[in-house]
Amino acid sequence: MWIDLLARERSDKMSEGEGQAKNRLFLGIDLGTSHTAVMTSRGKKFLLKSVVGYPKDVIGLKLLGRPYVVGDEAFEMRSYLDLRYPLQDGVLSEISDRDIEVARHLLTHVVKSAEPGANDEICAVIGVPARASGANKALLLKMAQEVVHTALVVSEPFMVGYGLDKLNNTIIVDIGAGTTDICALKGTVPGPEDQVTLTKAGNYLDERLQNAILERHPELQMNTNVACAVKEQFSFVGARGEAATFEFRAAGKPVRCDVTESVKIACEALMPDIIESIEILLRSFQPEYQATVLQNIVFAGGGSRIRGLAAYVKDKLRPFGNADVTCVKDPTFDGCRGALRLAEELPPQYWCQLGDVSGQ
């Protein structure tokens, strides 16, 4: 396989210039709307919220003691911070210089948290939505150039497939917070025609769930943070054996409500577009491979934790044949794990064959 040959070439070069190679730090970065997951070639891995917090006023500045804070710490201090999420629907906002500055603060923090050495050559593979625009990828690479030596942006579902060794006759469905990315893997680097990006994903589910709950219980005090907590605890499609009840607040007092039907409605609202996209990509394979593809449908991302998902999709695909639908074992890190593996197996000088690259 060509990857193996290139990996061997890199190994030869490492033995020739071992001193330089051992100072190369590889990063696999799954840069998400809600969370960013990172793995490094030195065994470090971490997850943080994709958010930057800035003091709302001088009191907030006094409490914080610095101009801004990134990640989970920012979210915990949200009462006196202005929270900025630099990624919308999985891609960087291009609205203003302020938005770009927020994204730069996030990316700088991510790389710093990987703990590179002073003399390290930092090489990062960064995941983006399957159909991210060229302009958006160029913007991300421009910022990456400020904090790493070489960067490659690749499709997020392709990263998952690479990490799982599923690069042929496979459909990967990555349900994130901002986007659901669906990719047909055919043994080559996927092109635009092999990929679909849907904006109905985790954040959309939160909004639908909040509205569905308030429709039944208008007295509740609700926001998307509460809806997200309900989703993470009870999300399901299909049938559920027992009632889902959650403790809310109404007029400041605790009240427990049955949210089973609301959760079902919100979660299943994602499914029609996903099923339709799988069907379209399935038909793009040569007919002799389609039965094999049906045996290799993989769900990844936070949305793959929805209970009953595999069985639900398998049933919806029944007209096409007997499908084997699975969910990844580690939705949090499978994307960046694939990115790191790609970075380590393929020398950076060949990254331009896979996607957009900076620093070469």
Curated annotation (Swiss-Prot):
Disruption phenotype: Non-polar single gene deletion has wild-type growth and motility. Has half the number of magnetosomes which are mostly incorrectly positioned and of lower chain length; magnetite crystals and magnetosome morphology are normal. No magnetosome-associated filaments are seen. Incorrect subcellular location of MamJ. Incorrect positioning of magnetosomes in dividing cells, leads to uneven distribution of magnetosome crystals. Deletion of 3 consecutive genes (mamJ, mamK, mamL) leads to cells devoid of magnetosomes or a magnetic response. Mg(2+) binds at E156. Filament dynamics depend partially on MamJ. It is an enzyme of class 3 (hydrolase). SMART domains: ACTIN (SM00268). GO terms for cellular component: cytoplasm; cytoskeleton. Changing D174A: Magnetosome chain partitioning, movement and placement in cell is seriously impaired, many cells have fragmented chains. Impaired magnetic response. Has lost MamK dynamics, probably has no ATPase activity. Cells do not separate totally. Induction: Part of the probable 17 gene mamAB operon. Coiled coil: none annotated. It is found in: Cytoplasm; Cytoplasm, Cytoskeleton. Its EC number is 3.6.1.-. Its main location: cytoplasm. It holds the Pfam family MreB_Mbl. Forms cytoplasmic filaments. Interacts with MamJ. Forms filaments in the absence of other magnetosome proteins and in E.coli. Filament formation in vitro requires ATP, GTP or a non-hydrolyzable ATP analog. This bacteria makes up to 60 cubo-octahedral magnetosomes of about 45 nm in diameter which contain membrane-bound crystals of magnetite (Fe(3)O(4)). This is Actin-like protein MamK. It comes from Magnetospirillum gryphiswaldense (strain DSM 6361 / JCM 21280 / NBRC 15271 / MSR-1).
